[in-house]
Amino acid sequence: MCGAVRYTITAPVEYVGYCHCSSCRQSSGSAFALFAGVKKVYLQITQGAVSMGNYVRNADTMAHFCRECSSVLFVAVRKGEYAHVQMGTLLKVPGIWPQSSIPKAVWADDITNGQPQFTEFPDWC
C-alpha cells in the first residue's frame, strides 16, 4: 500500500474468494477481505523484505504485513503452502471472479440486498 514492500506472483492465481472471519474483517476494516489464492512458492518478495512483519492468527494461519503502513499483504494458509494475497494490494487484478465466501456471512447470499449497482460513481455519491 505504501510501496515499502513489493512482490510479484509468478503463476496464475488459482482461486479468488471472500473471507468474513473476524481477523479478516478487522484487518481490512470492512465486512470481508477479498483475496487471491496462490501457492506460496509463486509469491516472490521483490523489495522491502526487511519491512515485513508477521503474526500467528491461529494454528492454521500466519498474516504477513508491512511494518511501515501496517497493511496486511497476505496470509499464509493450508500449512503455509498457500498465500491468500489481499486483492487491494495487487497492481494487476486477476481475471477471475470470486468463487466462495469463507466463512460465509449470513447476508452474503445477497450482498446488495436488492440495492442498485453502478459502473461509475453517481452524482450524489
Task: Locate the predicted segments by residue.
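A short Gly-Trp-Pro
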Residues: 4-125
